[in-house]
Structure formats: structure tokens, C-alpha cells
Amino acid sequence: MDYSNFGNSASKKFQDDTLNRVRKEHEEALKKLREENFSSNTSELGNKKHYRAQERMSSPLHRLSPTGKSDDRKVKSPLDDKLRRQLREGNTRLPPPPFSSYGMPPTNRSNLDRIRRRTSSPVRTDKFASQNVIDDQRLEIKYLERIVYDQGTVIDNLTSRITRLESFILNSISDRGDKNFASLEHSRSFSGFPTNKTYGLQMGGLYENDMPYRRSSDNINKEGAREDRSSQIHIENESTEDILKILSSSFHN
């Protein structure tokens, strides 16, 4: 019997058996991890499921390593610099890590918890929720701006209508002249409001011979007796109350 390669063949057979067992465990763990976090059809995506320590496998690197280094449990993270940069730049799903990352002891946080936390991406959900709030606020601001614009349009239309009404009334009074049979009644306490026959009525007040009208004794004598004047003013399509409001506002201005 040739014993020259006995040690090498036995060692190789042991390593093959170990690798086959590790691959089988890795496939089972990978299948379990995909069912939890890498299925886009499940509604449970992102929920944290805590594993017990018995469910974790010991690291295959530790099983294949010499016995003197069993206490050294610090293994490099499966995320290299390229994947970390991609994770920072955009929320992309991470590929399954190499099997050497499985079975890490629960020091601080295990690799499984870290991968599960990053693939579930709760930050992405919060970001989308805040963006929806911002969009709703922008729509509300646009709606309020539209209301303000509509109210401004209504105010402009009312202002233009009032201006046209004032000009129509004042032109009607000044154009009638001798044909106007009406005048406003005034008492001694009132500073005086002349008849349209004697004084021309213009925007902003009363004028006599291109000069502002001022009440005096001459004006009183010029107007004649109080009983000779009518106490109402007649303008087509307008009430006396509206005319008095417009005339009083222009008189005070």
C-alpha cells in the first residue's frame, strides 16, 4: 500500500466535505435571506426579524482556519468601497454578501442585521413621505395665490364700474344746464350746495368760473330764495341715495 499521498488525500477529502457542507448551509441561509428581504412582492418588506444565536452558523473561515486563531472573530465587512459608494449615491439594493459574512457573532450588530436594515431602506420611505408633504403645501400655496388673484380681479372690476358711474352722473348733471329742474336742499347749518344751473359740477368738488366754490353772503344773494328751489334731484336709472353718496364723497375729497 502506498502511503506517500495518504495524508494529502485525506486532507483533501476532509476539505471537500467541509466545503460541500458550507456551500449547502450557505444556500439555505441565502434562500432564507432572500425570502425575507429580497422579495419585492411581499408586504412584510423591511420588518425587522431578530434571530437567535442558535440560528446563526459559525463562520466557515473559522472552521477552516488553524485552531490558534479561533479567538480572532474580527472579519472584514462584505461591503467593499465600491458598494459603499453606490449605497451613498443612490438607494440601490445590495447583492447577496459572500458566505464568509454569515454566522458573525452578535457583537454590536451582526452583518445580517446591517444588510437587512440597509435593504429595507426606511430612510427612503421617510424621504418620500416628506416629499409628499412638500408637494401638498406647494399645491395649497398655488390655490391660495389663485384665490388672491381672483379677488383682485373682482376689486378691479368694481373700481372701474364705480369710476364709470361717477363720470356718467357728473357728465349728466353738467350737460343738462338749463334743462335740469332739480337742486339739492340745504339748511343754514350746511355750508352750502349750489344749484346745477348756477355752478358747474366737476370731479373733486364745485367750481364757479373756473374757481373753487366758497360759500359767502354774495353766493346766498345770488342763489335766490330758498322756497323757489326743489328739494329733489332726478337722474335717469339712478336713485337719489346713490347720487348723494357719490356727490358727498367727491365733495369731501
Curated annotation (Swiss-Prot):
It is found in: Nucleus; Cytoplasm, Cytoskeleton, Microtubule organizing center, Spindle pole body. Keywords: Cytoplasm, Cytoskeleton, Nucleus, Phosphoprotein. GO terms for biological process: mitotic spindle pole body duplication; regulation of microtubule nucleation. One of its GO terms (molecular function) is identical protein binding. Residues 69-91, 211-231 have a biased composition (Basic and acidic residues). Coiled coil: none annotated. The modification Phosphoserine is found at S65. Its main location: nucleus. GO terms for cellular component: central plaque of mitotic spindle pole body; central plaque of spindle pole body; cytoplasm; nucleus; spindle pole body. MPS1-mediated phosphorylation at Thr-240 is required for spindle pole body duplication. Pfam families: Spc29. Residues 1-20, 31-123, 210-231 are annotated as: Disordered. InterPro entries: Spc29. Residues 1-12 have a biased composition (Polar residues). The modification Phosphothreonine is found at T18, T240. Component of the SPC110 complex containing at least CMD1, SPC29, SPC42 and SCP110. Interacts with BBP1. Belongs to the SPC29 family. Component of the spindle pole body (SPB) required for the proper execution of spindle pole body (SPB) duplication. Links the central plaque component SPC42 to the inner plaque component SPC110. This is Spindle pole component 29. It comes from Saccharomyces cerevisiae (strain ATCC 204508 / S288c) (Baker's yeast).
